[in-house]
Amino acid sequence: MNFWYSRSKIAYLLLPFSLLFWLISTIRRFLFQSGILSAYKAPVPVIVVGNLSVGGNGKTPVVIWLVQQLQMRGLNCGVISRGYGSQSEVYPLLVNAETDPVRGGDEPVLIAKRAGVPVCISPNRQQAIELLLSSYPCDVIVSDDGLQHYKLQRDIEIVVMDAVRGLGNGWVLPAGPLRELPSRLADADFIIGNGGENVYTDTAMRLVPHYAINLVTNEKRELNAFEQAIAIAGIGNPDRFFKMLQDEGIRLVSSQAFQDHQKFSADLFARFAPNVPLLMTEKDAVKCGRFAQQNWWYVPVDAEITGEKSAALLDKIEQMTQQGK
């Protein structure tokens, strides 16, 4: 919402509701931190990857990057997620690359596919962890989102933020885009700026596209082979995806932004010209395989996070798994 990024009249009108939201969330956090309400402590280290603001910060690529980096160090990882948008009949649910994204959720299926890691979804994070640990030998649990889920104790907090949009107008919902006040960042262990750095971040992340993959044939094609294309995106920040394609020299005949976690059907794509290549995100592609056309392609991206601080973070996690808790 545009008014989240300025202190407009609409934002001021919503400010009383934001004060109520802040009061409730602050009391709730205090109750868990003081021990008045009990929080679950897992028998292995728990790393939470989340964000302070809503929508499109690049959290999922960071989860995939983190899991892959820890796997390279010989650690067995498990991922838990609330499974937003999933329609499973039962929770907790173990998710793999072949799970129907309608049941498992688009992001959990994508993580399982890209990282080859066991994923468990449930609104109850404790149940998700317990099922993972009883099913797989996990050395560490990575929580996809859940920064504000204080029922779960965590060993490390990683916050991902859009370095361009920042924290918007600095107000909490609904007057602003924040779930908690900016001062909450002081408690985070590591802050990643998607697209650059700012005063809050420890390091920057680039989302790097390498090629496009055909949804039907799995053919890989360099992005510079696409002179023009139609682009669609059902993610938190679709404009970032469209700009990335344009930066690669692709002329967009048209672009269509859908809601985050959009449920796709063949009918939604009937409007697009069949003779023009259609490019989509990998997150969207996991939901389109059953009705994909020959000229549909998805563009996987890799999170590029470097520097001494990111290496120190990985060292710290590895040491936790060796020393116990």
Swiss-Prot record:
Pathway(s) of this molecule: Glycolipid biosynthesis; lipid IV(A) biosynthesis; lipid IV(A) from (3R)-3-hydroxytetradecanoyl-[acyl-carrier-protein] and UDP-N-acetyl-alpha-D-glucosamine: step 6/6
Q: Which reaction does it catalyse?
A: a lipid A disaccharide + ATP = a lipid IVA + ADP + H(+)
Gene Ontology CC: plasma membrane
Domain of life, source organism:
Bacteria
Report residues binding ATP.
53-60
Annotated GO biological processes are: lipid A biosynthetic process; lipopolysaccharide core region biosynthetic process
Gene Ontology MF annotations: ATP binding; tetraacyldisaccharide 4'-kinase activity
The UniProt record lists the EC number as 2.7.1.130
According to its UniProt record, what is one Pfam family this protein matches? LpxK
What keywords sit in the KW lines?
Answer: ATP-binding, Kinase, Lipid A biosynthesis, Lipid biosynthesis, Lipid metabolism, Nucleotide-binding, Transferase
Q: What does this protein do?
A: Transfers the gamma-phosphate of ATP to the 4'-position of a tetraacyldisaccharide 1-phosphate intermediate (termed DS-1-P) to form tetraacyldisaccharide 1,4'-bis-phosphate (lipid IVA).
Similarity comment text for this entry: Belongs to the LpxK family.
The protein depicted here goes by the name Tetraacyldisaccharide 4'-kinase
Organism equals Actinobacillus succinogenes (strain ATCC 55618 / DSM 22257 / CCUG 43843 / 130Z)
The primary gene name is lpxK
